[in-house]
Amino acid sequence: MKQIFIWLIKGYRMFISPLFPPTCRFQPTCSMYALEAIERFGVFRGGWMGIRRILRCHPFHPGGYDPVPEVGEHCCHHDSGK
């Protein structure tokens, strides 16, 4: 299943993405982020991380450098202490 999603993202990057001007506000791009997240964390967790990243990619977000966290690194943005 993981390879299917990786193949779909690579297909998007190769055939669909070049048809539109670059608009991603982040580095790495959202599709590259999703690809790396799925490779590193698997389809469910990595896919969820990719979806959250795409939802943050809009004109009202400043964007910038936002790499995929390493395995074991805290990657969720919730407040666990309060």
From Swiss-Prot:
Subcellular location: Cell inner membrane
Domain of life: Bacteria
Record membrane topology: Peripheral membrane protein
GO cellular component: plasma membrane
Family matches, as InterPro entries: Membr_insert_effic_factor_YidD
Keyword list, A-Z: Cell inner membrane, Cell membrane, Membrane
Function: Could be involved in insertion of integral membrane proteins into the membrane.
UniProt record similarity statement: Belongs to the UPF0161 family.
PANTHER family recorded: MEMBRANE PROTEIN INSERTION EFFICIENCY FACTOR-RELATED
HAMAP family referenced in this protein's UniProt entry, alphabetically: UPF0161_YidD
Protein name per UniProt: Putative membrane protein insertion efficiency factor
